[in-house]
Amino acid sequence: MRRTAMGPEIAAALADPEVVEVMLNPDGALWVDRLGSGRQPTGVSMSSAVAERIIRLVAAHVNAEVHAGLPILSAELPETGERFLGVLPPVVRAPSFAIRKRALRIMTLADYVADGVMSEAQATFLRWAVRERLNIVVAGGTSTGKTTLANALLDEIAQTRDRVLILEDTVELQCRSDDHVCMRAEPGITTMADLVRATLRLRPDRIVVGEVRGAEALDLLKAWGTGHPGGIATVHAGSAAGALTRFEQLVQEVSVTVPRPLIAEAVNVVVFLGGRGRGRRVREIARVTGFDTQGYQLSHDLYLPSFSAPTTQPPGETP
């Protein structure tokens, strides 16, 4: 499916390397989210008829239904791989959609430091955490760069000889490892929880989940906590502590009892991202050290931007 089929304005936005997302609102206003300046209107107005045609065009290319009875379309644009979410009435006043572009390249941790997104000390700690096979959860709000950072961590994993199993419902992660398997959940066919359980029989060294958003949280925690360390996952949350609470909420979808000690044991590090575009920053890196009657025990002090990390051991460790 050619980008030009959506019209010259959208094609131009998708071709712009500074644009990360294109959004059409019910009032017909077309917006873009740029790396440097965030969300801004394009000044372009699109009719409801044209917007609906685009949504139906995408549906046709992915062999999906979309109509008043099934008004939400979630898809990947063929060939180019952008994430597309289209919505029709009656759930909105007029057709609307959002197109999220895939990353053009993998940002490394060195790139993050050069761009001021994280400090050298934070990057040093994360490299050590990957090398020591700690389980890392990347948390943040929408469009804060969780997947981009997960890709940077995957790039560090690629320097090992580990076998990596990557589980997603939308293809976004990129892995350079010579030995890796990508698996994808399909609505109505295979769930993320199914994939996590299947992964255990594929001899993984590390299990990576693009985004934890459902019952798979419990299966992932069990896998991480029982002989498969060194994984990565992303989750929507407003802080490092909030990421652990989010895991609790997801586990409760399938279990009455929340295994908080298991969460504390399985999740070793939480990286919290805040801001958007050029304003993205690693706001918090927390080491999960345990769980007691006071709740989760988190250590932050050693991973502040002002910390100067040793070269032979992780921040905060002494010989």
Regions found by a protein language model. Give the residues of each.
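Conserved lysine of the Walker
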Residues: 146
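Walker A (P-loop) phosphate-binding loop of P-loop NTPases
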Residues: 143
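Switch/coupling sub-region of P-loop NTPases
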Residues: 123, 133-136, 152-266, 272-274
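Conserved P-loop NTPase
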Residues: 264-319
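P-loop NTP-binding catalytic core
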Residues: 16, 33, 39-132
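Active-site phosphate-binding and catalytic loops of NTP-dependent enzymes
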Residues: 5-12, 58-77, 162, 254-260
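Hydrophobic anchor at the beta1->P-loop junction of P-loop NTPases
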Residues: 138-140
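N-terminal anchoring/assembly modules that precede and organize ATP-driven motor systems
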Residues: 1-41
